[in-house]
């Protein structure tokens, strides 16, 4: 992942925020958030070896996949939920985003841009699934399940009822502001739920409480 993404997320998250990092990895970035932004941070990671690395860093990390990991948190438990480098690996990204907004106020998502000029060129001239700096693994070894462009992600947010309040795009040369869907290799977006999604989540919470009372 481009280092500019990490620097951007550091700027977006205020000090002393409550942060949940989904797909924590070895915990290096979450530890940096704790140290530099003084956040209260927790993580979810399914790889036991990586969880052990997180524990060595003094982090609170739960071993679970992302879908099951979110179930253990109550409503509005966090200010920010992070999906950095894991969004395209999700089986049901819309469901995870909705659940992330249940437990958090804002969601930060990073993803690779499948409409980058090099990706287009490899498909057009080579007729093969592209391999690039941001998509380094061949199709049979990649963890990615979804291949999307910046425009696709914008449409996804609109369909889901989510506002993209900020976005930063990057390629090998640095930040990209002009023609990002064509020139950017990676992007990170700051998301907020609009009133429609917020109402839907609130209704679902109410229905869940009713079912609990009936039991």
Task: Label the predicted regions.
Residues 23-25:
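Class I SAM-dependent methyltransferase "Motif I" SAM/SAH-binding loop
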Residues 27-31:
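Glycine-rich SAM-binding Motif I of class I
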Residues 32-60, 65-69:
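Class I SAM-dependent methyltransferase SAM/SAH-binding core
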């Amino acid at each position: 992942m481009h280092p500019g993404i990490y620097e951007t997320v550091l700027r977006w998250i205020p000090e002393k925020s409550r942060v949940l990092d989904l797909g924590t990895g070895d915990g290096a970035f979450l530890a940096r958030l704790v140290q530099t932004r003084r956040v209260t941070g927790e993580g979810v990671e399914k790889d036991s070896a990586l969880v052990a690395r997180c524990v060595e860093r003094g982090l609170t990390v739960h071993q679970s996949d992302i879908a099951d990991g979110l179930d253990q948190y109550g409503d509005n438990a966090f200010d920010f939920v992070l999906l950095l480098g894991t969004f395209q690996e999700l089986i049901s990204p819309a469901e995870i985003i909705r659940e992330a907004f249940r437990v958090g106020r804002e969601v930060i998502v990073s993803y690779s841009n499948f409409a980058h000029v090099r990706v287009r060129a490899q498909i057009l001239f080579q007729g093969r699934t592209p391999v690039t700096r941001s998509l380094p693994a061949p199709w049979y070894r990649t963890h990615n399940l979804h291949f999307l462009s910046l425009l696709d992600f914008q449409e996804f947010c609109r369909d889901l009822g989510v506002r993209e309040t900020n976005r930063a795009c990057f390629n090998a040369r640095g930040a990209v502001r002009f023609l990002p869907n064509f020139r950017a290799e990676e992007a990170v977006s700051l998301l907020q739920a609009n009133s429609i999604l917020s109402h839907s989540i609130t209704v679902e919470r109410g229905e869940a409480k009713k079912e609990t009372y009936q039991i």
